[in-house]
Structure formats: C-alpha cells, structure tokens
Amino acid sequence: MYRALRLLARSRRLLRVPSAGAAVSGEATTLPRCAPNVARMASQNSFRVEFDTFGELKVPTDKYYGAQTVRSTMNFKIGGATERMPIPVIQAFGILKRAAAEVNQEYGLDPKIASAIMKAADEVAEGKLNDHFPLVVWQTGSGTQTNMNVNEVISNRAIEMLGGELGSKKPVHPNDHVNKSQSSNDTFPTAMHIAAAVEVHKVLLPGLQKLHDALSAKSKEFAQVIKIGRTHTQDAVPLTLGQEFSGYVQQVQYAMVRIKAAMPRIYELAAGGTAVGTGLNTRIGFAEKVAAKVAALTGLPFVTAPNKFEALAAHDALVELSGAMNTAACSLMKIANDIRFLGSGPRSGLGELILPENEPGSSIMPGKVNPTQCEAMTMVAAQVMGNHVAVTVGGSNGHFELNVFKPMMIKNVLHSARLLGDASVSFTDNCVVGIQANTERINKLMNESLMLVTALNPHIGYDKAAKIAKTAHKNGSTLKETAIELGYLTAEQFDEWVKPKDMLGPK
C-alpha cells in the first residue's frame, strides 16, 4: 500500500495507551480569566499556563496539547482511557491537516509555517504523537474537542520545530494556521471517512479475503465427501461436504462485494464545507485540492463530496458501511455455528468435522477441548450487530445542518471493521485450515438417514415413499428392508434407484 497506509499500519503495532492519569498529569485547574500574549511557564509541578476563550488553564509541560484539550478532560470524565478517541481517527486527522496545509500554502500561507505544520501533521499520521491525544469519544457530538486537540498538538509541535515557546501560539496558531479554511464540522467527518476507508482496506477486506480463500480450499478438498444434508436441523437429502462449504465461500464473497459497494460514498470527503456546508472562509477549489492531496497521501480514491450539506448533516455512508459489516457478521455467525455444530462431540455429537485442538477446554473436565475459535467468532458477530444498532441510531439523528453523533458512530464503525478483520484471520489460521472430514462418521450417518427415500419419489410416488420412511423409523428397520417388506419394490430396484452419488444435482 502507499506510504501513509504503511505508516499507519506500523504505528498501530507500536501503539502504547498510557494510563488516564498519565494523560493529563493530574487535575487541571482553572485560573482567573485573562488572555496573555504569551504562555507563562510554571516552574513548579511541571505545568505551563495556556488560555482559551474561557480563561487560563494549567497544561502539563511534557504535552503538546493545549488549553482546550485540558478543558475537555475536565468536562468529560467518561469511561477513562479505554474510551479514548480511536487512534485511526487521530492519524486520519494528521493526513487531513497535512493536506490542508499544503493547499493553504498554495493559497498564500507562509511556507515556513506550512512546512512546520506538514511535518508535525506527518508525525501525527505516523502515530509518533499518540500520547498527546487523551480525549474520550464521549464529548461534543461534532468532535470539536478532538479537532482542537489535533490543532493544538500540531501547532505546539510546529512551534517547537521552529524554536518557539510551547503554548505561545506563535508563530503557528492552532486556529488561524492549522485549522485554516476548516471547521470541526467538516474536518471530523472527513477524518471519519479517511479512518474508515483505511481500516477497511488494511484490516477488514484482507481478513475476509483470507477466510474466503481458506474456505474455498476446503470446499475443493471435500468435493467428493458425500454426507447427509439437514434442513430445520432435521435429516434431509444428501450433498457433498464441498457443496456445503461452497455456500460459506459465497457468503464471504458477497460480504466483500457489499463492503466494496459501500466504499464510493466513504471516499467522498466533507472537507471544504466548513461550518454548515456553504464553504464559508475557504477559497474556490480548496475542497477539490484537499481531497486530491488526501488521495495521493493514502493511495485511496478520495474525492470531494458533491454536496457538503449532506456530508455534514447526515452520515448515511457510514450507516451503509456498517450495514454491510452487519450483514457480514450475520454470515460469519452462521458459518461459525455450522462448523462448531458439525464438529460437536467427539462421541455424542454430530462429529462430521474434526476441528483443530488448540487449548484445554475445561478447568474441571480432563481432556475436554472446545470449539473456541467458533465461539470467538460468534461473539464478534454479536458485537458487530450491536455496533450497527448504535450506528443506526446515530445516523438517524442528524438535526438540521449537523449530525452530532459523529464520535460514537466512527468508534463503532472502526470497532466493527477491526473485529471482523481480526476475527476472520484468527478463525482462518486457528480453525478453518485445520478442519478435517470425519468420513467414517459421515458415511454412518448418511446410510442411516431416512431421507434417502426421496430418491424413490419419481419411481413409486410420494405417498408410498413416505410410508416406507415412517414405517422404517417406527420399526427401527432400514429403508431397503421396509420397502421390500411393504412390497413396493425389489432389492435390485432399491439398489438401482437409491444411490447418494446420484442425488447431488439435477439430471
């Protein structure tokens, strides 16, 4: 993949989530209102003093964020470190802020300032500054605090690069320069789409493709294994184990098709819409140029959204993508359940599949082994279904010119993409590739099945065939014995007409 995608993948592997206490280095304290021209560095307790429009706040000297970030940590103490804004969103912001700085330089932003912003934004995109983003998802529904967290971090890092004083907002101002031609209302949805697209391409689709390929290989491996089918969990007519697995292959294939079909709307970026979609305080061409820069940085086909009012006020694209993932979760739930039920036993279940044994299954029953990968996959599927409910509620609550469920929506979309991608890889590596067919058990169950009688329908009719099946079941006899005893056909006729290998498709 392209440069930014490689950097994002590398940064995720190196990600360290600090404790909630380390994030803000203690309780922030509100000081008397004033707006100094430069920040006053506090000599005690390793704080510096910064200000926002509400007044002064103490900021840890070892952090690049500023007053608005500190104020958010004071106002939204919800959930702790585990509820932080997803790092993919922060890294997407880094990509966006770099692209905006490039375009703003074309429109007259001081090249020295633009260059420093771009370098700092690159560090954000690469995950080098993850420790400086302490805010939780549960904040303003527009994501304004996170946008300002990004602006402050990039501003202070750029100031440091230029030899200035942290918190001074000189020579790089978080609003006037880093956020130039932007609003939280268009930057956050842009970052949402960038993050979602990257996660889909880096994690979700590769995971599903791996699972698809493994299931396809098993379908071919089991092509000659004839088994009894089941409908309503009851015996049905035969099919091959390969045919059964081919259904799973198609489900995963369609899952990828649906996800890819949702991506063109994800590639549309809100950047340039600013506050309500009109593009106030931007230059003509800014939106198109930013989208092109983001596309170049990520290697993904991003374009400017054709209607910025829709891009800010509604997030139907994310609901659509979440819906595709929800459908994938339904498919994976069915596949995992089928495989674990077919592997149930080892002596008292169906036992048609032999599943890999990966770890002890019980703290009290010696020798017990469980279908743990199937269980993990079904739990992931359930979580994704729940995530989609939240995304659906969020998407339906765009009021007037702005949807204010943005952070919650992207948190759940990214969570679903990551879980499905990772679970698909785990399920493939630790279960699917090691599945074996228990042909002895499969043959035994098939030969005992009463539904082989269906092959007699064209020869003796439905009613007589049903009589054979019911009588055989009642008496505990075989179909062949019962058919002969009832006088409906000879042994030779039964052997000629009831052949499982001839019951696998149309004639």
UniProtKB/Swiss-Prot annotation:
The modification N6-acetyllysine is found at residues 58, 63, 77, 112, 119, 210, 220, 289, 499. GO terms for biological process: arginine metabolic process; DNA damage response; DNA repair; fumarate metabolic process; homeostasis of number of cells within a tissue; malate metabolic process; positive regulation of cold-induced thermogenesis; positive regulation of double-strand break repair via nonhomologous end joining. It comes from the Eukaryota. Gene3D superfamilies: Fumarase/aspartase (C-terminal domain), Fumarase/aspartase (Central domain), Fumarase/aspartase (N-terminal domain). The modification N6-succinyllysine is found at residues 58, 63, 77, 112, 119, 220, 289, 464, 470. It is an enzyme of class 4 (lyase). The modification Phosphothreonine is found at residues 82, 233. The active site is at residues 232, 362. The modification Phosphoserine is found at residue 363. One of its GO terms (molecular function) is fumarate hydratase activity. GO terms for cellular component: chromosome; cytosol; mitochondrion; nucleus. Pathway: Carbohydrate metabolism; tricarboxylic acid cycle; (S)-malate from fumarate: step 1/1. Keywords: Acetylation, Chromosome, Cytoplasm, DNA damage, DNA repair, Lyase, Mitochondrion, Nucleus, Phosphoprotein, Transit peptide, Tricarboxylic acid cycle. Substrate binds at residues 142-144, 173-176, 183-185, 231, 363, 368-370. Disruption phenotype: Embryonic lethality. Conditional deletion in the kidney leads to the development of renal cysts, reminiscent of hereditary leiomyomatosis and renal cell cancer (HLRCC) phenotype in human. Renal cysts are caused by accumulation of fumarate that promotes the formation of non-enzymatic post-translational modification cysteine S-succination (S-(2-succinyl)cysteine) on proteins, such as Keap1. The record marks 375 as: Important for catalytic activity. Its EC number is 4.2.1.2. Residues 1-41 form a transit peptide. The keyword Cell membrane does not apply. SUPFAM superfamilies: L-aspartase-like. There are 2 substrate-binding sites: the catalytic A site, and the non-catalytic B site that may play a role in the transfer of substrate or product between the active site and the solvent. Alternatively, the B site may bind allosteric effectors. Belongs to the class-II fumarase/aspartase family. Fumarase subfamily. Homotetramer. Interacts with H2AZ1. HAMAP family: FumaraseC (MF_00743). Catalyzes the reversible stereospecific interconversion of fumarate to L-malate. Experiments in different species have demonstrated that specific isoforms of this protein act in defined pathways and favor one direction over the other. This is Fumarate hydratase, mitochondrial.
